[in-house]
């Protein structure tokens, strides 16, 4: 089954050309099936790139997906054209006002990890989003800073600044092979990482409500399950394109910022050579498993989501 996207959203043509099954809203309306309603709260500056990355993953499942783009109400993006935001996004306050519900919500990261959470300009509204998910979303997936922010809000799990940026592709261990979110995962998983902060395993372990599903000896916890809040928190970037780390590295080199060559990414650690994507299959497994678990457990009646 396809993902439903507006015909003029850039991701529509990009994913169609990649072989992802994409359907227009008009065509979707003729099918006698309830699609899964998945929202993307996009906090990233380059919103189109992020839309494409997540739409590519959730659009590859056998289920029909109604993909909804959401942004913070008062934060104005300087890196995405206003007409794109006006055409394809709704402000969270508009979504909240309608009372509508979602089978799933992805909350992205944001390049603001150096700030204490409470100093983020839209923190108050974001905490309102977190509370709203408990009555209006069946399953929430917090990604990188978005996951850290959720874990701080619900559990006061600290984020800690690193002396050096964790940057590259790091080996991770599958700690719970029987988890429905890790079906088909290898025991050893390579995952892109790009962050200046970390959460620490001993502090995660001190919170009984959190279960670590994937972790690395080098860069710590990667994927946590928070059953009580129907949430997953992933601190690394399964969704990254093949060249995302390269783009970040090249950007920092050009701007003169101190940056190391991303670990275990370029062949022979040579930035002049094209990187090889060795995480794509696990990215599809993770988000496909998440979508499948939502499908298996959500209410058929969307309005009943959030009921005890």
Swiss-Prot record:
Keywords of this entry: Acyltransferase, Amino-acid biosynthesis, Cytoplasm, Methionine biosynthesis, Transferase
Pathway: Amino-acid biosynthesis; L-methionine biosynthesis via de novo pathway; O-acetyl-L-homoserine from L-homoserine: step 1/1
Active-site residues, Swiss-Prot/TrEMBL: 144 (acyl-thioester intermediate), 237 (proton acceptor), 239
Gene3D superfamilies: 3.40.50.880
Domain of life of the organism encoding this protein: Bacteria
Compartments it resides in: Cytoplasm
Chain segments annotated as transmembrane: none
Catalysed transformations (reactions): L-homoserine + acetyl-CoA = O-acetyl-L-homoserine + CoA
Residues with site note (Important for acyl-CoA specificity): 113
EC number: 2.3.1.31
GO biological process: L-methionine biosynthetic process from homoserine via O-succinyl-L-homoserine and cystathionine
Entry similarity comment: Belongs to the MetA family.
HAMAP family: MetA_acyltransf
NCBIfam families recorded: metA
Protein name (Swiss-Prot/TrEMBL): Homoserine O-acetyltransferase
Organism: Paracoccus denitrificans (strain Pd 1222)
């Amino acid at each position: 089954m396809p993902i439903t996207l507006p015909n003029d959203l850039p991701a529509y043509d990009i994913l169609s050309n990649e072989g992802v099954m994409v359907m227009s809203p008009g065509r979707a309306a003729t099918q006698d099936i309830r699609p899964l309603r998945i929202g993307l709260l996009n906090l990233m500056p380059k919103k189109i790139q992020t839309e494409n990355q997540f739409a590519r993953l959730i659009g590859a499942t056998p289920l029909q997906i109604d993909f909804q783009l959401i942004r913070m109400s008062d934060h104005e993006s300087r890196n995405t054209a206003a007409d794109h935001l006006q055409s394809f996004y709704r402000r969270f306050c508009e979504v909240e006002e309608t009372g509508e519900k979602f089978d799933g919500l992805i909350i992205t990261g944001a390049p603001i990890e150096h700030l204490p959470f409470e100093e983020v300009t839209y923190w108050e509204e974001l905490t309102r989003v977190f509370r709203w998910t408990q009555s209006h979303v069946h399953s929430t997936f917090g990604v990188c800073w978005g996951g850290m922010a959720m874990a701080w809000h619900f559990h006061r799990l600290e984020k800690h600044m690193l002396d050096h940026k964790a940057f590259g592709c790091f080996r991770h261990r599958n700690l719970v092979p029987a988890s429905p979110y890790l079906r088909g995962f290898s025991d050893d998983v390579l995952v892109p990482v790009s962050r200046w902060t970390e959460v620490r395993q001993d502090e995660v372990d001190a919170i009984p409500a959190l279960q670590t599903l994937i972790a690395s000896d080098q860069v710590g916890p990667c994927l946590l399950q928070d059953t009580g809040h129907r949430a997953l928190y992933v601190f690394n970037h399964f969704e990254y394109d093949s060249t995302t780390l390269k783009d970040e590295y090249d950007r920092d080199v050009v701007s003169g910022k101190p940056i190391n060559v991303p670990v275990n990414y370029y062949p022979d650690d040579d930035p002049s050579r094209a990187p090889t994507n060795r995480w794509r299959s696990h990215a599809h497994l993770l988000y496909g498993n998440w979508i499948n678990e939502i499908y298996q457990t959500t209410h058929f009646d969307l309005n009943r989501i959030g009921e005890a």
